[in-house]
Design a protein with these regions (language model features):
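Blade/loop signatures of beta-propeller domains
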Residues: 10-44
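Conserved beta-strand positions in repeat-built beta-propeller and related beta-rich domains
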Residues: 22-23, 51-52, 61-63, 68-74, ...
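A short beta-strand motif characteristic of beta-propeller blades
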Residues: 46-50, 87-92, 129-132
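Short coil turn/linker residues within repeat-based beta-strand modules
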Residues: 75, 85-87, 126
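Blade-loop segments of beta-propeller domains
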Residues: 79-114, 118
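A generic, well-ordered mixed alpha/beta core segment in the N-terminal half of proteins
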Residues: 117-132
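Conserved small/polar residues in nucleotide/adenosyl-binding loops
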Residues: 134-136
Length: 136
């Protein structure tokens, strides 16, 4: 079954009106697929908060702490951006070249670890639990 991006857009942003943002809004941003432009409100302010990732992937937002985690895969680290302080720090290094993250229903970080060939969960106390039963 082929995914229809327009259907997904209407379900995710039901009140969004598509309008191409002004060119200066996208300065320094590489747009690979023009459909991305349909998701940006023309009055949005885009701010760059970090440079220095070789390959960034897997952002996940934690609203209770108002921060975002993401992977810098080749540099083997997870970075953390604090929305209040506007500071980016290293959350975990090394991190087994994590490639993706999400939050489970209890708000814990679940991570795909490339070099360890596993899926892990980080407990509130920082303990890392292996969720994979079979290593490939």
């Amino acid at each position: 079954m082929k995914h229809n991006p327009m259907t997904a857009k209407s379900q995710i942003f039901p009140n969004h009106r598509s309008s191409r943002p002004p060119a200066d809004l996208l300065e320094g941003i590489q747009v690979v697929d023009d459909r991305f432009l349909e998701l940006i409100d023309r009055h949005t302010v885009i701010e760059k908060h970090w440079t220095g990732c070789e390959w960034a992937e897997g952002p996940v937002y934690f609203p209770e702490g108002d921060y975002v985690l993401w992977s810098d895969v080749p540099n083997n680290r997870i970075l953390k951006f604090d929305a209040q302080s506007k500071e980016t720090t290293v959350f975990r290094e090394p991190c087994n070249n994590t490639t993706g993250h999400y939050r489970d229903q209890q708000g814990r970080l679940v991570t795909c670890e490339h070099s360890a060939n596993r899926i892990s969960r980080t407990e509130p106390d920082g303990t890392i639990i292996n969720l994979s039963l079979i290593h490939i």
